[in-house]
Amino acid sequence: MTYLQESSRPAVTVPKLQAMRDAGEKIAMLTCYDASFAALLDRAGTDVLLIGDSLGNVLQGHATTLPVSLDDIAYHTACVARAQPRALVVADLPFGTYGTPADAFANAVELMRAGAQMVKLEGGEWLAETIRFLVERSVPVCAHLGLTPQSVHAFGGFKVQGKTEAGAAQLLRDARAIEAAGAQLVVLEAVPTLVASEVTHMLKIPTIGIGAGADCSGQVLVLHDMLGIYPGKRPRFVKDFMQGQPNIEAAVDAYVKAVKDGSFPGPEHSF
């Protein structure tokens, strides 16, 4: 059995994402951890596959993403890349792997050798030097602002960020800083809709929302969440796309369509 894709769909590249944003075409992103799902998500037209440290939650059973190692991400990145998807492959730099620019570069190189085409890291102004260091060395970077799960203990839990005037102002400063440093994409997680909208209109790079309203350039969900596979309480920003669908591929098709036509997320999925 092979998972290699035979598709006439043009490959999604970093410049392609920028062109989509500039043209007003929504970007559909999902997490992905293996070759079989990479092939399925790619057939459905998913634009970006994220090998997220969320695998610590949904695959390994941890309460947070903190135990996930670089080897874990590299292994699952290689699994996804073997399917040769047309979607852009983005891999998370896990907790503790980008404390210095040099560490970030060495670890990003390992993920790119495994098949990543971009790396994602969590943080704002304080990461500007690291982002610039990576970009200058040909490593495309996706930043992650708002609720950054690797900071769960610093935040005191999984809480909406940017709700106060001071918090919103800091988020705007962070967004300006990461763009100026060269980030080509930014995820906004659990951010009030109005703040995320302001960030999206302020920046020239694409924004990807998760619990950040419908004005972002695109949306992302954890694959298991959008398929209704989650323990405990469902986060507000999650919609179960398996409901009413005959199979997983139809559910993914429905997700991609809903992101593209702007029907997801609705107000009930936002803050």
From Swiss-Prot:
Gene Ontology CC terms, in alphabetical order: cytoplasm
Keyword Metal-binding applies: yes
GO annotation terms (biological process): pantothenate biosynthetic process
Keyword tags: Cytoplasm, Magnesium, Metal-binding, Pantothenate biosynthesis, Transferase
Molecular-function annotations in GO: 3-methyl-2-oxobutanoate hydroxymethyltransferase activity; magnesium ion binding
Pathway listed: Cofactor biosynthesis; (R)-pantothenate biosynthesis; (R)-pantoate from 3-methyl-2-oxobutanoate: step 1/2
Pfam families to which the protein is assigned, alphabetical: Pantoate_transf (PF02548)
Binding site for 3-methyl-2-oxobutanoate: D53, S54, D92, K120
Names of the cofactor(s): Mg(2+)
Transmembrane segments: none
Subcellular location: Cytoplasm
InterPro entries with a match to the protein in the record: Pantoate_hydroxy_MeTrfase, Pyrv/PenolPyrv_kinase-like_dom, Pyrv_kinase-like_dom_sf
E.C. designation(s): 2.1.2.11
HAMAP family per UniProt: PanB
Subunit architecture: Homodecamer; pentamer of dimers.
Family: Belongs to the PanB family.
Protein name: 3-methyl-2-oxobutanoate hydroxymethyltransferase
Source organism of the structure: Burkholderia multivorans (strain ATCC 17616 / 249)
